[in-house]
Amino acid sequence: MAVYIFMVLFLYSCSWLDFKANRKIGYILFTFIFFLFVLHDGLRWETGTDWGNYYRFFLNCLWDEWEQFEPGYVLFNQLIRGLTIDYNVFLLCEAVIVWGLIFPTIRKYSPDPLLTLFCLYCTLLPVLGMNRQLISLAISIYSIRFILNRQWIFFYLSILLACPFHLSILIFAVAYFLNSKLKTKYYVLLLVVCIGLSVFDVIDKYFGEIVPYVSGDDTRLMGYTEIESTGVNASFLGIARKSLWLFLAYPLLKKEREGLLLLSFNLYFLSLLIYTIFNGTDFQIIVSRGTNYFTIYEVFIVSYVVYGYKGKGVKIIMLFVYFIGMLYKGIDYYSVGRYNPFIPYQFCF
């Protein structure tokens, strides 16, 4: 826990710096935090989800066939494995790629980059260890510049580039059409419809039988479902958290016709709709992996909200609530019994 506590407290302290008013110090901290993130992900050992599967795959990827992994991820492993047997070299290379795509996007578009990094760490902790999807997630975050610049060819080329690492990226293809504002009544109507579908259990009643056909590896699905089934309260808190930030962000959209705030709002709102429909159904764990591409934009929404509502008192309250909620999600979400893949954080040396 010491590593997580240090990271959270350090990033929280950095988030108080006014980046725009102290650009020189801000750039230094931003660069330092980049290397801190790389070392945090690259030097871990037996820490994070799916550690054993990915570690064994790396050791044997030059001669064993692993059909369950996408070709891009296989090739990436083979390239590094051909040079060294040290798995941490692979993790460091992956971390450089992932954060090398995410950090420039935050620096370019976030209203408060250091605050966004604090939110990012709290949000992505449960994704630590999901090597394949983390690469495709990083590519998707980098690709939002093409949405904002209306360069649809480059956006969909980015999607194609991410597919060899994790096919779930295909769900993000809809993002290009979400950079426009809807009338309030349409947001409300969509949410009411999704709540209705959830209350009347429409998904399981009419589509539950196809779960085995879309889940692929049933053994892994059952394992993840067991994890999900322990978190009913966490699911409710997830819906409440999403609703809270959307409610706080909506007044800031009055002058927004396009831009990152509007795009982030719509992507995050879509994650709320999907989460509401599939929460508690047999599809929950399958869909939750896909919604990571939308949920991640919470980090930008929180930054806009905290930045938009001036006042130190407001900032303290908002960040405290955010920290407590994300700490609960990040540390306890994957606990099954006494086992937790994140605790303790272990270094490779």
Sequence positions of predicted segments:
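Membrane-interface transmembrane helices that cradle and orient dolichyl/undecaprenyl
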Residues: S140-I153
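Signature aromatic-anchored transmembrane alpha helix within multi-pass, membrane-resident enzymes
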Residues: L191-V192, K310-K329
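Membrane-embedded helix bundles of polyisoprenyl
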Residues: P113-M130, L134-I141, S168
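Transmembrane-helix signature of polytopic, membrane-embedded enzymes
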Residues: K24-I25, T31, F103-Y121
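Transmembrane-embedded, aromatic-rich helix segments that form part
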Residues: F155-S158, S168-N179, L190
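Alpha-helical transmembrane segments and terminal signal-anchor/GPI-anchor hydrophobic tails
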Residues: T47, G52-R56, E67-E70, V74, ...
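Membrane-embedded alpha-helical segments of multi-pass membrane proteins
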Residues: A2-W16, L36, C93-I97, N131-I139, ...
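TM-lumen/periplasm interface segments of multi-pass membrane proteins
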Residues: L17-F19, R23-A95, Y328-F349
